[in-house]
Amino acid sequence: MGLHLNEGGDDLAENHEINVTPFIDVMLVLLIIFMVAAPLATVDIKVDLPASTAKPAPRPEKPVFVSVKADQKLYVGDDQVPAPAQLGAMLDAKTKGDKETTIFFQADKGVDYGDLMEVMNNMRAAGYLKVGLVGLETAAKK
């Protein structure tokens, strides 16, 4: 006859696992807070740039203009540049190889900023570091 004696211990086994439910609840609340707050941090700010009050620099006898039209066509003076890679060669022809010549850069207001920077980088790669940006003089008189 077998007799089973209870030695006074608990019948429930101890649970050695970590309860992650409160941790998940806190993480979900933080996720929701950041999802709501993130769009507020990326508000577009309208910047109305001031007009320059500086006096216009004297114009050289034969200025060299690089222009970007609204249709994304690039010109050196009145001559269209067939490819952006040929900009340096056309500038060399206009300036007779003088890299110290100031290049006047003008662009239509509808041209993307990235396209402007690409043209500026092409001029810099060709060795033309003196670049003047051309704007409307009437904007400075407001």
From Swiss-Prot:
What is any one of the record's Gene Ontology cellular component terms?
plasma membrane
Membrane spanning stretches: 23-43
Full protein name: Biopolymer transport protein ExbD
Q: Which GO terms describe its biological process?
A: protein transport
**Residue ranges, Cytoplasmic side:** 1-22
**InterPro entries attached here?**
ExbD, TonB_ExbD_1
**Endpoints of the signal sequence:** none
This protein's gene is called: exbD
Write out the similarity annotation. Answer: Belongs to the ExbD/TolR family.
> What biological function has been recorded for the protein in this entry?
Involved in the TonB-dependent energy-dependent transport of various receptor-bound substrates.
Keyword tags:
Cell inner membrane, Cell membrane, Membrane, Protein transport, Transmembrane, Transmembrane helix, Transport
Instruction: List the stretches on the Periplasmic face of the membrane.
Output: 44-142
